[in-house]
């Protein structure tokens, strides 16, 4: 079901990109699950109906979901939404983990252009992580289009392979939490 959520979002983003809309805030917090467990993209507050958008005003931005070119040059395209999709896919697989946990925004500005990327979640299949890595390529034109991402995720769904190992996830969900904390 987790990969189906990702496939639903990719299909929705393919539609938006065909209409030349840039979402600019694609994240798990902006995906709603509706009837029949269909994931739908929400919160279009930062979206723009342009092929390329250059931000020229100040304001709060979702830094942990932003592509390198958006962080460095305030340039947003469908390919920067693809980067954000890779982060969203990481969120789905990690069952709501915080992207770049423990890193400051300043560290992201410094490390992402140097090639740093989030590690593969322990419960994540190599093929899913490779898709994330494709979304996080330095050069926007090297990132896959949403049409390709959608096809890839649907193909994975049809393979009926365990791309997210829930048994492994249970082994580290609460690691490092003091058992006596519940009693306090």
Swiss-Prot record:
GO terms, biological process: angiogenesis; blood vessel development; endothelial cell-cell adhesion; heart development; vasculature development
Compartments (UniProt record): Cell membrane
GO molecular function: ATP binding; transmembrane receptor protein tyrosine kinase activity
Tissue and organ expression note: Expressed in most populations of endothelial cells in 24 hours embryos, including the endocardium.
Chain ranges of the Protein kinase domain: 1-164
UniProt function note: Transmembrane tyrosine-protein kinase. Required for the formation of facial lymphatic structures and brain lymphatic endothelial cells. Also required for embryonic ventral and dorsal migration of parachordal lymphoblasts along the arterial intersegmental vessel. Plays a role in the embryonic formation of the dorsal longitudinal anastomotic vessel.
Assembly and oligomerization: Interacts with svep1.
Annotated protein name in UniProt: Tyrosine-protein kinase receptor Tie-1
Gene expressing this chain: tie1
């Amino acid at each position: 079901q987790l990969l189906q959520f990702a496939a639903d979002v990719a299909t929705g983003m393919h539609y938006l990109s065909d209409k030349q809309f840039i979402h600019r805030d694609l994240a798990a917090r902006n995906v709603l699950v509706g009837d029949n467990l269909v994931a739908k993209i929400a919160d279009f507050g930062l979206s723009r109906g342009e092929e390329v958008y250059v931000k020229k005003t100040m304001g709060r931005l979702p830094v942990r979901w932003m592509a390198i070119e958006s962080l460095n040059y305030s340039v947003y395209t469908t390919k920067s939404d693809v980067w954000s999709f890779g982060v969203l896919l990481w969120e789905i697989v990690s069952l709501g983990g915080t992207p770049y946990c423990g890193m400051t925004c300043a560290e992201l500005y410094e490390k992402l252009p140097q090639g740093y990327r989030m590690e593969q979640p322990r419960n994540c299949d190599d093929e899913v992580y490779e898709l994330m890595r494709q979304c996080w390529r330095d050069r926007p034109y090297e990132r896959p289009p949403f049409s390709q991402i959608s096809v890839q995720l649907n193909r994975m769904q049809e393979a009926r392979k365990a791309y997210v190992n829930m048994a492994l996830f249970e082994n580290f969900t609460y690691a490092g939490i003091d058992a006596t904390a519940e009693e306090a």
